[in-house]
Amino acid sequence: MTTPGGDTPLPDPAFPEDRYPCLPYLEEEYRKRVRLGRGRLARSTVVFCGLARDVAPALPATRARLERAGALCADYRVVIVENDSRDETPDLLARWRRDDDRVDVLSEELGLPRLPAGRGRARMEQLAACRNRYLDRIDDRYDDADYVIVVDTDLPSGFSYQGLLS
């Protein structure tokens, strides 16, 4: 898989489905749900959305995964809210936006402090405020979408495509 320009290889977006097997007694039902989900998604418009801050190391793989997931849909959009990154995240997102008109990036310097990971109230309020930015954008521009799927943009292992379909 390469970038739309064709010269930069993107990471393999494959998810190690075999490392997370379905319980044997649920296998038949799971396969049925995946099959039905594949048909439903193929007829649907989906908005994938998420937050990004200093996620440059994971962003090429996230991009590849979202493009692969988007290919399962009749149509899709990606809405990413980025703020206060100190790495190459804004540049990578701007390049993705230039390469693909389905990608919508809100990038801004808010001066928000870095808060430690965890469940602290201040961090949750900060994340909620940023989340509301992409919800507003979706309401303004993509309210005809059939589904909205929130993604973590910094997951090293990605997400299960079969799980998405189920």
Show the residue positions of the predicted features.
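Short, surface-exposed basic-aromatic patches at helix termini and helix-loop junctions that form
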Residues: R68-A71, A94-D99, L165-S166
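Conserved donor-nucleotide/metal-binding helix-loop-beta segment in metal-dependent transferases, i.e.
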Residues: L155-S166
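N-proximal low-complexity "stem/linker" segments adjacent to membrane-targeting elements
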Residues: T2-R68
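Preference for well-ordered, secondary-structure-rich cores of eukaryotic proteins
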Residues: T45, A61-R63, E67-G70, R77-V79, ...
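Short beta-strand-to-loop acidic/aromatic patch adjacent to the donor-nucleotide binding site
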Residues: Y142-P156
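Active-site-proximal specificity loops/subdomain of glycosyltransferases
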Residues: E88-A145
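Short beta-strand/turn micro-motifs composed of small residues
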Residues: A52, E82, D152
